[in-house]
């Protein structure tokens, strides 16, 4: 969609499609959608509360839904075509025809005792394949000490991207975000600014939970002092993850990019040094 205030028109169209779909679902006796998704690519919908308030003239609408019955998705897709053709000015499409309902396929992984599994070699069971079941260790986990506290009283904000590299990806319905400081002396500053709560606030629109405190429970932070790095694990954050998710970024590949905008409080000398280096950022 393109034209003035495209993001507002796109959002209104998307909400209207779901409203019309729900009215039809109710009329034919079908239950509501189990999950819906509206993403306006180009209007910073991935940024949540941290999106910049600006009017854009061009967006791509990515709209999706889940329903227990394929007929429910059929109704949704019919409304997409009907309202798309009849209502919004400036709407264009790159695919001809109507999309089709597709099943949601999930991966279910679980552990079973090794003794439950037989080993076969050349089609014959290997009798000596029984493995003694290992026991979980009761030893207390040894975690690295936190970096030294920052002694400077006067601190100024600097974006994380000036201090670190970042990359993210998925593990099922969980996401990992790795932060590696550009220099070891930056680790303390990053560690004490980029807390679990700071990460939760940046990604709260993706994380499951009805309250911020519930969402915070899904965020864990792990320190890797040997490489001046931090890893964040966020659970229940990908809408099912992989092919089970209806989101544009089902693998959390852009989560690290969202964090790179985070303000990190640093000593003035670091800010002066980095601001003078045009190669960083």
PLM-predicted stretches and their roles:
Residues 1-157, 180-185, 192, 200-226:
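C-terminal non-catalytic interaction/assembly regions of soluble proteins
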Residues 140, 280-281:
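Eukaryotic N-terminal low-complexity, Ser/Thr- and Lys/Arg-rich leader segments
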Residues 165-185:
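Conserved phosphate/anionic-ligand binding catalytic regions in large, soluble enzymes, centered on
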Residues 185-193, 243-246:
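A cross-kingdom feature strongest in bacterial/archaeal respiratory oxidoreductases
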């Amino acid at each position: 969609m393109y034209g003035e205030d495209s993001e507002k028109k796109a959002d209104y169209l998307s909400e209207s499609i779901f409203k019309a779909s729900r009215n039809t679902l109710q009329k034919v006796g079908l239950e509501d959608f189990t999950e819906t998704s509206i993403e306006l690519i180009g209007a910073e919908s991935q940024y949540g509360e941290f999106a910049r308030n600006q009017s854009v003239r061009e967006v791509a609408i990515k709209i999706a839904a889940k329903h227990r019955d394929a007929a429910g998705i059929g109704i949704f897709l019919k409304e997409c075509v009907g309202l798309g053709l009849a209502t919004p000015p400036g709407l264009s499409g790159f695919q001809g025809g109507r999309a089709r309902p597709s099943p949601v396929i999930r991966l279910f992984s679980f552990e079973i005792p090794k003794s439950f599994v037989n080993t076969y070699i050349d089609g014959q069971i290997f009798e000596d394949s029984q493995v003694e079941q290992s026991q979980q260790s009761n030893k207390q986990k040894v975690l690295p000490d936190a970096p030294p506290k920052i002694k400077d009283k006067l601190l100024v904000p600097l974006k994380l991207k000036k201090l670190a590299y970042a990359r993210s990806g998925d593990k099922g319905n969980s996401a990992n975000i790795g932060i590696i400081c550009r220099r070891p002396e930056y680790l303390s500053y990053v560690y004490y600014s980029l807390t679990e709560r700071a990460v939760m606030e940046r990604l709260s629109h993706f994380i499951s939970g009805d309250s911020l405190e519930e969402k915070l429970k899904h965020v864990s932070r792990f320190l890797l002092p040997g490489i001046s790095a931090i890893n964040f694990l966020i659970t229940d954050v990908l809408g099912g993850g992989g092919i089970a998710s209806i989101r544009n970024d089902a693998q959390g590949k852009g989560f690290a990019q969202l964090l790179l905008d985070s303000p990190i409080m640093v000593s003035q000398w670091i800010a002066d040094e980095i601001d003078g280096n045009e190669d960083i950022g």
